[in-house]
């Protein structure tokens, strides 16, 4: 991608994948996404040779952080039914969008959605190049996704009624 650094590309990729893996429904991940597969800017590679379509396994070493993030998000999704409710009425009952600034999507999965052990889960996706904040219910929250890291056991605690998410990244917290 022209005019973008590798660091920004990685941040945006992780942000996009967080949107995919925290959305309801069946997630779809293309082959090689977890290692930043590159098709050399060929937009329709159907008839391109293997040199364009192959998986470059060296990228797995080069982008370990990306692979680990994907694996962590997949594990988080599998462990928490709130991210994969099976019926539309469940989604309507347990998912609510949170007011957010331009370039930010925020939602809450509430009331132990899908039978989840976590009572409330806030997902905040920030596409802006500056930190952004959203107002939430006053409380003490455990961070499980922040700054390109995933840890279901927790990355720290946040108390209060404001969640601030780093530029071009995602924040997931629960109580």
Predicted regions and their residues:
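Short, polar loop/linker segments at the starts of domains and inter-domain junctions
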Residues: 1-6, 151-162
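Loop/helix patches that line or flank the sugar-binding groove of alpha-linked glycan CAZymes
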Residues: 1-139
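Short, surface-exposed, polar/charged, turn-prone segments marking secondary-structure boundaries
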Residues: 56-59, 83, 149-153, 170-172
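Short, flexible beta-strand-to-coil junctions
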Residues: 111-113, 129, 145-148, 175
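Solvent-exposed beta-hairpin/edge-strand motifs
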Residues: 137-150
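C-terminal beta-strand-rich structural cap/linker in extracellular carbohydrate-active enzymes
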Residues: 155-175
């Amino acid at each position: 991608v022209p005019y973008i650094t590798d660091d920004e590309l990685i941040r945006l990729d992780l942000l996009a994948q967080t949107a995919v893996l925290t959305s309801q429904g069946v997630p779809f991940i293309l082959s090689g996404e977890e290692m930043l597969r590159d098709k050399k800017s060929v937009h329709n590679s159907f008839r391109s040779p293997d040199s364009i379509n192959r998986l470059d396994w060296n990228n797995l070493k080069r982008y370990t952080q990306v692979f680990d993030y994907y694996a962590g998000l997949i594990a988080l999704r599998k462990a928490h039914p709130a991210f994969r409710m099976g019926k539309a009425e469940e989604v309507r009952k347990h998912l609510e969008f949170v007011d957010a600034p331009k370039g930010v999507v925020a939602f809450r999965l509430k009331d132990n959605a899908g039978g989840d052990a976590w009572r409330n889960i806030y997902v905040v996706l920030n596409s802006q190049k500056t930190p952004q904040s959203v107002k939430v219910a006053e409380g003490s929250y455990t961070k499980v996704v922040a700054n390109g890291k995933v840890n279901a056991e927790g990355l720290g605690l946040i108390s209060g009624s404001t969640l601030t998410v780093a530029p071009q990244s995602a924040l997931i917290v629960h109580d």
